[in-house]
Amino acid sequence: MTSSEPRFVLAWVTREGERCTKMGEGGSVLFVEHPERGWEIPGGHLEAGEHPEEALHRELLEETGLTGTLVSWNKTYYSEGWVAHVVVPAQYSQPWTVDDENVHAVRWWDIVPPVKAWTVEEFEELAIIFSD
């Protein structure tokens, strides 16, 4: 990893055919429920030698069971991490669980869910960054 690469990546996940909007304005975003940190967007740290896009897709698959298409990166919101807008097929709509001890549930939210380790403002600002 070079100094220009992130330490972690996060995925702002929306559904195919659904506009990416501000929270509460029509679109929905995928969140995972961590046992200690509560609701958050999927993501994690890069493994040794891993490219940020590889880490993004690996974390998305591990934490949600989904694969998606990378639309764009925001490389400036967090000083040590990148946030990607990822689109997944529209058929995924109901809450579900995955075989990951760090994820209790996976769910679409059209408002910022109850958060513990994050702030409502973070998710509202990210929604503005990625909105159409």
What is the predicted function of each stretch?
Residues P35, H45:
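Residue-level signal for short, function-critical loop segments
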Residues M1-V29, Y78:
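Conserved N-terminal beta-strand and adjoining loop/helix that marks the start
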Residues F31-E33:
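Short, acidic/hydrophobic/Gly-rich beta-strand patch recurrent on exposed beta strands
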Residues E36-W39, P114:
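A short, flexible beta-alpha/helix-coil linker loop
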Residues L46-S131:
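Unchanged
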Residues E40-G44:
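A short gly/proline-enriched turn/hairpin at secondary-structure junctions
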